[in-house]
Design a protein with these regions (language model features):
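Mid-core helix/loop region of P-loop NTP-binding domains shared across ATPases and GTPases
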Residues: 75-82, 89-144, 164-165, 169, ...
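Hydrophobic/aromatic beta-strand patches that form the interior of the parallel beta-sheet core
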Residues: 41, 66-68, 144, 177-178
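A short, basic N-terminal segment
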Residues: 1-38
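A short beta-strand-to-loop transition that corresponds to the Sensor-1 phosphate-sensing loop
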Residues: 145-151, 155-159
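A short helix-turn-beta junction within AAA+ P-loop NTPase domains corresponding to the substrate/partner-engaging
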Residues: 63-65, 158-181
Length: 192
């Protein structure tokens, strides 16, 4: 439809109020640090704690930061074209041209940050392409991957099975998973 192509909403969106919770503060601090230093990280935590809201809010208020819902762009082609489109790079045409234009653009702007939410939904080829994109933009672009505990399990299982690319990808994202909520059940309940 024309409204979809132009990005026009046909209904009023509910306005959300920002509650600066411990989750909001933690993720915002991580995103700011990542963007300012062009470092990458992975956040894996339980659902419904405000990860997505915080990431979207951050992108609205910070230059050169984009939010990608990976559950909507699971394939390599869709993912790269979506990232390009979010930065205003031409996402149509030959894939190789889109890829080259995107990596060139990311290396030429100041402190780009790409937030990959629901990253556990990405297909294997898309994960490999993230590694390639990271390599092509090293020290000039920050990448922040987010997901629930399933993302951590997917990466760990793939590393244990010696699936090509996962060990390298984890190392590029800091070799660890960050988490907001406490592991202990009683502490987590008090936190939430």
């Amino acid at each position: 439809s024309i409204s979809r192509r132009l990005g026009v909403s046909l209904r009023a969106d509910m306005e959300w109020k920002v509650a600066k919770t411990a989750t909001f503060e933690y993720i915002t601090a991580q995103l700011e640090f990542s963007q300012q230093s062009s470092l990458s990280a992975i956040l894996c935590d339980i659902p419904n704690i405000g990860k997505t809201f915080t990431a979207r809010y951050y992108v609205q208020n910070h230059k050169n930061a984009v939010y990608i819902d990976c559950s909507q762009v699971k394939t390599k082609l869709k993912l790269v074209r979506k990232i390009a489109a979010e930065f205003g790079v031409d996402a149509k045409g030959k894939y190789s041209d889109v890829y080259e234009d995107l990596t060139y653009y990311l290396r030429s702007i100041e402190n780009p940050l790409i937030i990959l939410d629901e990253a556990g939904d990405l297909q294997y080829e898309a994960f490999l392409e993230l590694k390639a994109l990271w390599n092509a933009t090293e020290r000039s672009c920050a990448w922040y991957m987010m997901g629930a505990d399933g993302l951590k399990e997917k990466i760990n299982r793939s590393i244990e099975c010696k699936k090509v690319g996962y060990t390298e990808m984890l190392s590029r994202y800091g070799d660890r998973y960050s988490k907001v909520t406490p592991d202990d059940g009683k502490e987590r309940e008090a936190f939430l």
